[in-house]
Design a protein with these regions (language model features):
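Active/ligand-binding-proximal structured segments within catalytic/core domains
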Residues: 1-19
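Charge-rich, well-structured scaffold segments of protease-associated domains
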Residues: 17-184
Protein backbone atom coordinates (compact mmCIF):
# COMPACT_ATOMS: atom_id res chain seq x y z
CA UNK A 1 0.00 0.00 0.00
CA UNK A 2 2.85 2.39 0.73
CA UNK A 3 3.96 2.55 -2.90
CA UNK A 4 0.40 3.03 -4.17
CA UNK A 5 0.40 6.80 -3.80
CA UNK A 6 0.49 9.73 -1.39
CA UNK A 7 -1.51 12.91 -0.86
CA UNK A 8 0.90 14.77 -3.16
CA UNK A 9 1.26 11.90 -5.66
CA UNK A 10 -2.10 10.09 -5.47
CA UNK A 11 -1.35 7.21 -7.84
CA UNK A 12 1.44 4.78 -8.56
CA UNK A 13 1.97 6.56 -11.88
CA UNK A 14 2.22 10.02 -10.25
CA UNK A 15 4.66 8.65 -7.67
CA UNK A 16 6.77 7.01 -10.41
CA UNK A 17 6.83 10.23 -12.43
CA UNK A 18 8.02 12.18 -9.39
CA UNK A 19 10.80 9.64 -8.75
CA UNK A 20 11.84 9.84 -12.38
CA UNK A 21 12.07 13.65 -12.04
CA UNK A 22 14.52 13.04 -9.19
CA UNK A 23 17.04 11.44 -11.57
CA UNK A 24 15.42 8.03 -11.44
CA UNK A 25 15.39 7.70 -7.66
CA UNK A 26 14.09 4.28 -6.66
CA UNK A 27 11.71 3.64 -3.80
CA UNK A 28 10.34 0.30 -2.68
CA UNK A 29 8.97 -1.75 0.18
CA UNK A 30 8.87 -5.37 1.20
CA UNK A 31 7.63 -7.28 4.20
CA UNK A 32 9.31 -10.32 5.75
CA UNK A 33 8.48 -12.51 8.69
CA UNK A 34 11.33 -13.02 11.16
CA UNK A 35 10.38 -15.36 13.98
CA UNK A 36 7.20 -14.00 15.53
CA UNK A 37 7.78 -10.50 14.16
CA UNK A 38 7.35 -8.71 10.89
CA UNK A 39 10.06 -6.58 9.30
CA UNK A 40 8.93 -3.84 6.96
CA UNK A 41 11.83 -2.76 4.78
CA UNK A 42 11.49 0.58 3.03
CA UNK A 43 14.38 1.41 0.75
CA UNK A 44 15.36 4.20 -1.55
CA UNK A 45 18.37 4.76 -3.78
CA UNK A 46 19.38 8.04 -5.38
CA UNK A 47 22.32 9.34 -7.35
CA UNK A 48 25.21 10.90 -5.47
CA UNK A 49 24.77 14.67 -5.78
CA UNK A 50 28.42 15.15 -6.79
CA UNK A 51 27.56 13.62 -10.18
CA UNK A 52 24.78 16.12 -10.94
CA UNK A 53 25.39 18.95 -13.43
CA UNK A 54 24.20 21.49 -10.85
CA UNK A 55 23.60 21.58 -7.09
CA UNK A 56 20.35 19.94 -6.03
CA UNK A 57 19.73 18.49 -2.59
CA UNK A 58 18.44 15.03 -3.47
CA UNK A 59 18.89 13.75 0.07
CA UNK A 60 16.29 16.19 1.40
CA UNK A 61 13.98 15.23 -1.49
CA UNK A 62 14.51 11.57 -0.59
CA UNK A 63 13.66 12.22 3.06
CA UNK A 64 10.55 14.16 2.02
CA UNK A 65 9.52 11.13 -0.03
CA UNK A 66 9.81 8.94 3.08
CA UNK A 67 7.67 11.44 5.00
CA UNK A 68 5.05 11.54 2.25
CA UNK A 69 4.84 7.76 1.96
CA UNK A 70 4.75 7.08 5.70
CA UNK A 71 2.81 10.03 7.09
CA UNK A 72 0.79 11.32 4.14
CA UNK A 73 -0.44 8.27 2.22
CA UNK A 74 -3.40 8.62 -0.11
CA UNK A 75 -5.99 8.26 2.68
CA UNK A 76 -9.51 9.61 3.08
CA UNK A 77 -11.85 9.00 6.02
CA UNK A 78 -9.54 6.54 7.78
CA UNK A 79 -8.82 4.30 4.81
CA UNK A 80 -6.62 4.13 1.73
CA UNK A 81 -7.88 5.19 -1.68
CA UNK A 82 -10.42 2.47 -2.61
CA UNK A 83 -9.14 1.91 -6.14
CA UNK A 84 -5.52 1.61 -4.97
CA UNK A 85 -6.53 -0.75 -2.16
CA UNK A 86 -8.44 -2.98 -4.58
CA UNK A 87 -5.50 -3.08 -7.01
CA UNK A 88 -2.94 -3.86 -4.29
CA UNK A 89 -5.17 -6.53 -2.76
CA UNK A 90 -5.66 -8.15 -6.17
CA UNK A 91 -1.89 -8.10 -6.82
CA UNK A 92 -1.21 -9.75 -3.46
CA UNK A 93 -3.88 -12.37 -4.06
CA UNK A 94 -2.36 -13.20 -7.44
CA UNK A 95 1.12 -13.51 -5.86
CA UNK A 96 -0.24 -15.86 -3.20
CA UNK A 97 -1.94 -18.03 -5.82
CA UNK A 98 1.25 -18.18 -7.91
CA UNK A 99 3.29 -19.12 -4.82
CA UNK A 100 0.85 -21.93 -4.03
CA UNK A 101 1.24 -23.17 -7.62
CA UNK A 102 5.04 -23.21 -7.23
CA UNK A 103 5.90 -26.74 -6.07
CA UNK A 104 9.01 -25.65 -4.18
CA UNK A 105 7.25 -22.83 -2.30
CA UNK A 106 4.25 -25.04 -1.58
CA UNK A 107 6.53 -27.80 -0.27
CA UNK A 108 8.44 -25.35 1.91
CA UNK A 109 5.19 -23.97 3.36
CA UNK A 110 3.99 -27.51 4.09
CA UNK A 111 7.33 -28.37 5.73
CA UNK A 112 7.08 -25.42 8.13
CA UNK A 113 3.38 -26.06 8.71
CA UNK A 114 4.11 -29.64 9.82
CA UNK A 115 7.34 -28.84 11.70
CA UNK A 116 5.78 -26.06 13.72
CA UNK A 117 2.32 -27.48 14.16
CA UNK A 118 0.38 -25.33 16.61
CA UNK A 119 3.15 -22.70 16.83
CA UNK A 120 4.34 -19.61 15.00
CA UNK A 121 6.52 -21.64 12.65
CA UNK A 122 3.41 -23.24 11.14
CA UNK A 123 2.00 -19.89 10.01
CA UNK A 124 2.87 -19.06 6.41
CA UNK A 125 4.97 -15.92 6.17
CA UNK A 126 3.19 -15.15 2.90
CA UNK A 127 -0.32 -15.23 4.33
CA UNK A 128 -3.39 -17.04 3.06
CA UNK A 129 -5.78 -16.17 0.24
CA UNK A 130 -8.78 -16.98 2.45
CA UNK A 131 -7.64 -14.47 5.08
CA UNK A 132 -6.84 -11.83 2.49
CA UNK A 133 -10.45 -11.84 1.35
CA UNK A 134 -11.56 -10.86 4.88
CA UNK A 135 -9.08 -8.00 5.41
CA UNK A 136 -10.62 -4.54 5.09
CA UNK A 137 -9.15 -1.29 3.91
CA UNK A 138 -9.79 0.32 7.30
CA UNK A 139 -7.96 -2.50 9.12
CA UNK A 140 -4.87 -2.11 6.93
CA UNK A 141 -4.71 1.66 7.49
CA UNK A 142 -5.30 1.25 11.23
CA UNK A 143 -2.46 -1.29 11.36
CA UNK A 144 -0.11 1.13 9.56
CA UNK A 145 -0.89 3.84 12.12
CA UNK A 146 -0.30 1.40 15.01
CA UNK A 147 3.05 0.36 13.52
CA UNK A 148 4.16 3.97 13.08
CA UNK A 149 3.18 4.83 16.64
CA UNK A 150 4.38 1.72 18.49
CA UNK A 151 6.98 -0.31 16.60
CA UNK A 152 10.76 -0.10 16.85
CA UNK A 153 12.33 1.66 13.87
CA UNK A 154 15.90 1.65 12.56
CA UNK A 155 17.28 3.79 9.76
CA UNK A 156 20.39 2.69 7.88
CA UNK A 157 22.18 5.14 5.61
CA UNK A 158 24.63 3.50 3.22
CA UNK A 159 26.93 5.37 0.86
CA UNK A 160 29.42 8.18 0.57
CA UNK A 161 28.16 10.17 3.57
CA UNK A 162 29.54 11.72 6.73
CA UNK A 163 28.03 11.88 10.20
CA UNK A 164 26.50 15.32 9.62
CA UNK A 165 23.85 13.50 7.58
CA UNK A 166 22.20 12.53 10.88
CA UNK A 167 21.30 16.20 11.39
CA UNK A 168 19.68 16.33 7.95
CA UNK A 169 17.48 13.38 8.93
CA UNK A 170 16.61 14.88 12.30
CA UNK A 171 15.59 18.15 10.64
CA UNK A 172 13.55 16.58 7.85
CA UNK A 173 12.17 13.22 9.00
CA UNK A 174 9.16 13.26 11.32
CA UNK A 175 9.76 9.87 12.93
CA UNK A 176 13.33 10.42 14.19
CA UNK A 177 12.37 10.71 17.85
CA UNK A 178 11.39 7.03 17.74
CA UNK A 179 14.24 5.86 15.53
CA UNK A 180 17.83 4.66 15.77
CA UNK A 181 19.99 6.00 12.92
CA UNK A 182 22.95 3.89 11.74
CA UNK A 183 25.60 4.92 9.19
CA UNK A 184 27.38 2.35 7.00
Amino acid sequence: MLTGGTENYPSTQALSTHLEDLYGMSFGTNLATKGIGQVLNISSVCINETFLPYQENLLVQQIKMFNDVLFHPNVRNGKFDEQTFAIKKKELKERLIVQNDDKFMYGLDQLFKNMGEGGFLSISNNGYVEELDRITNEEVYKYLVECLENDVKHLYVVGDVDESIVDVFKENLIVTQYMDIHLK
